[in-house]
Amino acid sequence: METTTTKKPYEVVVLMHPDASLEEQKDLFKKNKATIESYKGSINSLETWGKRTLATPIGKLKKAIYFHSTFEADTQAIAELERTMRINDKVLRFMHTRLDERTSLGKFMEGFKKGLAESAAREKEREAKAAARKAAFAAAKAERSERYDKGE
């Protein structure tokens, strides 16, 4: 009896060490692409989110390089991808998730990118507020120093 393998949609988020070189990043995803294609799968998208702050530190690391990818493959490809990522020292964390087959991948990515843009906007807003607080603190410190120098 012949078994047929059906490709299912997946997404993966990979967190790499913040000191990973561009070559190491490219090598990882070349290997992943080769693995997926060897199991007759296909990659739909690969996005680099860049270096971001972790929600909780991993060891002593507070930042990681984030990657997001969507692809179609069978379950054997997932097992092989996970095996190769566990071996790689530069991969801190990864998570494969099977996507709902009832939702088209295009529709999923549309909603995902909208959420990602909102998250980036919130992060920029937080950074701007932190910079404003830092500037206000520096100005207050300079004013106190000035008054102290005058002997007030």
Curated annotation (Swiss-Prot):
What molecular function terms (GO) are annotated for this protein?
Answer: small ribosomal subunit rRNA binding; structural constituent of ribosome
Q: Which CDD domains match?
A: bS6
Q: Does the keyword Nucleus apply?
A: no
The job of this chain, per UniProt, is described as: Binds together with bS18 to 16S ribosomal RNA.
Give the similarity note: Belongs to the bacterial ribosomal protein bS6 family.
**Cross-referenced InterPro entries, in alphabetical order?**
Ribosomal_bS6, Ribosomal_bS6_sf, Ribosomal_S6_plastid/chlpt, Transl_elong_EF1B/ribsomal_bS6
What is the name of this protein?
Small ribosomal subunit protein bS6
SUPFAM superfamilies reported for this sequence: Ribosomal protein S6
